[in-house]
């Protein structure tokens, strides 16, 4: 799985070493170690290796629908996860959704510039304070339940570590404390992935068409189809009827709870392996196909892995700390043991 790698100062450098082949491999290692040292596994373990997560897992639900007997289980450990260097392991119970799309401006009339037209449209969709200004965009957002609010407000959030990891000196709107944590759980985000144009007109010196590729990280109750309808209505209402929206892939958001037997086993065993309590989150800003799997199967999911905040996932010099990696495999061994005896 990791064909070419380099080890420097206790870190293994290789593409996919942290996100997320490395975390998957650590669980294979845990199974192999358990069988060689302790013998027969105390539980049945199934592996599902799915290679389309980065494009929205378009065929995952087909596989689940066609193979219910292969999926049925008492719990799912989902792909990868992270920890703070010299800090706690992060355990996630859910994810934000993602909806991707393009907005295209084709050959505007009167020699107008399609790039500027897109910029003006984008300016109507989000303001300088990071609020999404698409009409009715947040109408359906599910507020935190009393349980979720208490959990979020009582949960530690290492702001300094997050600022250091992301190379910033403050958060958007200068948020801090509970307001910052609530934003993470209850606000969607809108991101520009790239803006491009095609074919410069030799007469006007302007591109003939332009497009912007975007994504929205969604929170519970936001549905991709409804968001695209709201965006279409917003553009039309602001004079951009000529702009075309091309929908891309999407995954749904899911806000879980740490109350399943699997979650309790993982959280307990993290403290034993790492010598400090797990940093538990109901959801993370990232996205994957977790929500659709939970909705289709009802199986509780826990998300942990072998990355840390120096791993540089999806980037050059991706790496994993070998000590953390070994502990991650040990954690899985303990989870196998303890989950088998919980009721």
Where are the model-predicted features located?
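A generic structural motif
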Residues: 18, 107-110, 216-224
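Short glycine/serine- and small hydrophobic-enriched flexible loop segments
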Residues: 29-36, 120-124, 216, 334-337
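Histidine/acidic-residue-rich, glycine-tolerant segments that coordinate divalent metal ions
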Residues: 39-114
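A short core secondary-structure module
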Residues: 62, 109-132
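Active-site metal-coordination/substrate-binding segment of hydrolases
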Residues: 1-46, 327
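A common structural junction motif
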Residues: 125-129, 232-241
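Residue-level recognition of well-ordered beta-strand positions that form the cores
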Residues: 102-106, 124, 213-217
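An extended, acidic, His-containing surface patch that forms the Zn2+-binding/catalytic region
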Residues: 85-86, 134-209, 217-230, 238, ...
């Amino acid at each position: 799985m990791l064909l070419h790698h380099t080890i420097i100062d206790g870190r293994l450098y290789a593409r996919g070493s942290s996100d997320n082949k490395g975390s998957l491999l650590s669980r294979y290692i845990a199974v192999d170690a358990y069988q060689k040292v302790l013998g027969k596994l105390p539980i049945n373990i199934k592996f599902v290796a799915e290679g389309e997560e980065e494009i929205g897992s378009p065929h995952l639900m087909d596989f689940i629908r066609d193979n219910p007997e292969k999926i049925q289980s008492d719990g799912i450990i989902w792909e990868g996860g992270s920890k703070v260097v010299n800090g706690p392991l992060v355990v996630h119970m859910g994810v934000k959704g993602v909806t991707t799309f393009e907005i295209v401006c084709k050959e505007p009339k009167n020699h107008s510039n399609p790039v500027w037209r897109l910029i003006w449209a984008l300016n109507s969709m989000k303001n300088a304070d990071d609020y999404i200004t698409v009409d009715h965009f947040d109408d359906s957002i599910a507020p935190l339940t009393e349980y979720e609010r208490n959990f979020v407000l009582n949960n530690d959030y290492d702001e300094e570590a997050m600022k250091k990891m992301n190379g910033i000196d403050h958060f958007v709107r200068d948020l801090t404390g509970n307001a910052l944590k609530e934003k993470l759980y209850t606000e969607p985000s809108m991101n520009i992935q790239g803006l491009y144009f095609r074919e410069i007109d030799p007469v006007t010196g302007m591109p003939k068409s332009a497009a912007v590729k975007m994504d929205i990280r969604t929170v519970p109750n936001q549905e991709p189809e409804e968001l695209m309808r709201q965006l279409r209505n917003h553009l039309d209402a602001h004079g951009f009827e000529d702009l075309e929206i091309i929908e891309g892939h999407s995954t749904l958001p899911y806000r879980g709870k740490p109350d399943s037997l699997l979650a309790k086993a993982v959280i307990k065993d993290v403290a034993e392996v790492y010598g400090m309590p797990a940093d538990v989150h109901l959801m993370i800003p990232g996205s994957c196909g977790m929500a659709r799997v939970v909705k289709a199967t009802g199986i509780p999911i826990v998300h942990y892995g072998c990355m840390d905040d120096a791993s540089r996932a999806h980037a050059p010099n991706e790496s994993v700390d070998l000590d953390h990696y070994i502990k991650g495999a040990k954690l899985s061994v303990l989870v196998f043991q303890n989950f088998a005896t919980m009721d």
